[in-house]
């Protein structure tokens, strides 16, 4: 077998191609077979132990997820922490409608890393309060919403227009959501808004389908029709056409009816049709969560 001089041969217990580790002038090159069923076991059995000997410290991370406020505001709030950070470190990541903060520590073991990270997580929760929806990397915003619904023993329905059922699609990603989500209405036309949700003809004529009043009536009508504790409505202009000076493309109104009380919000999103709809879905989840936190 042709093996570079001084290299370490890694046995392949799941195939024929061996792996190699080569060291030269402080640099390390690691060659592994391509198929995942060969590469992953080889990494775990041979490469990981080799690297641990080279670097006795481990790196451990934890995520703090925030919704309802933008990346620039989050960055401003934690500027002092970032400026004086050494170990642990905080790294912000922007996602549509969310900001994720990854806190990373380096220490001799996982327990020590967790001890170092804990006060940082505590400080972030203190600064951002209810806007923190998760401190685990795997937890999603829709899971946070469903958890709140179950915790409060409340049911949810959705009345969507411009998002076309995309809010419902996000929520049904969560296993066991049938305990909380009753149904969703996709009322894209004015006729459907009247027939399914009881939106008044006068509202559609005088205020228009893209209005706070329409969003309010959609939410109230959806809650009544579905007999749910909560109903979230979305109506807006995703474009590319249909916008006016008074109601430009990207204008979205949402209503949330929680136990008979309905509040509305107005948003102005930018981007193409897909991006506007994506932002609307993310803000809809945040809106539901906010209403649930305030609903008694």
Language model: regions and residue ranges:
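A short linear hydrophobic-aromatic micro-motif
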Residues: 86-92, 229-233
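Proline/glycine-rich low-complexity loops and linkers
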Residues: 1-54
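Terminal amphipathic helices with adjacent charged low-complexity linkers/tails
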Residues: 95-119
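Short glycine-/aliphatic-rich beta-strand segments at the starts of folded cytosolic domains
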Residues: 54-70
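Short alpha-helical segments enriched in small residues
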Residues: 112-296
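Short beta-strand elements
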Residues: 21-22, 92-94, 105, 253-258
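Short beta-strand
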Residues: 10-11, 90-95
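Short amphipathic alpha-helix segments
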Residues: 69-87
């Amino acid at each position: 077998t042709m093996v570079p001089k001084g290299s370490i041969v890694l046995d392949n217990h799941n195939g024929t191609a061996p792996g190699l580790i080569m060291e030269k002038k402080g640099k390390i090159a690691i060659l592994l077979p391509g198929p995942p069923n060969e590469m992953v076991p080889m990494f775990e059995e041979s490469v990981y132990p080799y690297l641990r000997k080279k670097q006795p410290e481990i790196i451990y991370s934890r995520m703090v997820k925030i919704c309802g406020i933008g990346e620039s505001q989050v960055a401003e709030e934690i500027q002092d922490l970032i400026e004086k950070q050494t170990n642990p470190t905080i790294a912000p990541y922007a996602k549509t409608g969310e900001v994720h903060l990854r806190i990373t520590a380096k220490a001799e073991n996982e327990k020590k890393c967790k001890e170092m990270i804990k006060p940082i997580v505590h400080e972030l929760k203190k600064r951002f309060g209810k806007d923190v929806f998760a401190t685990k990397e795997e937890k999603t915003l829709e899971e946070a919403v469903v958890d709140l619904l179950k915790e409060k023993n409340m049911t949810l329905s959705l009345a969507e227009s411009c998002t076309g059922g995309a809010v419902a699609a996000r929520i049904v990603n969560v296993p066991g959501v049938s305990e909380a989500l009753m149904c969703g209405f996709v009322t894209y036309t004015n006729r459907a808004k009247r027939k399914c949700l009881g939106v008044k003809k006068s509202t559609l004529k005088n205020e228009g389908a893209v209005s706070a009043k329409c969003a309010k009536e959609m939410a109230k009508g959806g809650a009544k029709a579905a007999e749910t504790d909560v109903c979230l409505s979305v109506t807006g202009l995703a474009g590319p056409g249909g916008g006016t000076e008074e109601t430009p493309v990207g204008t979205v109104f949402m209503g949330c009816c929680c136990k008979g009380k309905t509040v509305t919000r107005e948003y102005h999103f930018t981007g193409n049709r897909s991006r506007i709809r994506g932002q609307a879905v993310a803000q809809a989840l945040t809106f539901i969560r906010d209403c649930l936190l305030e609903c008694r």
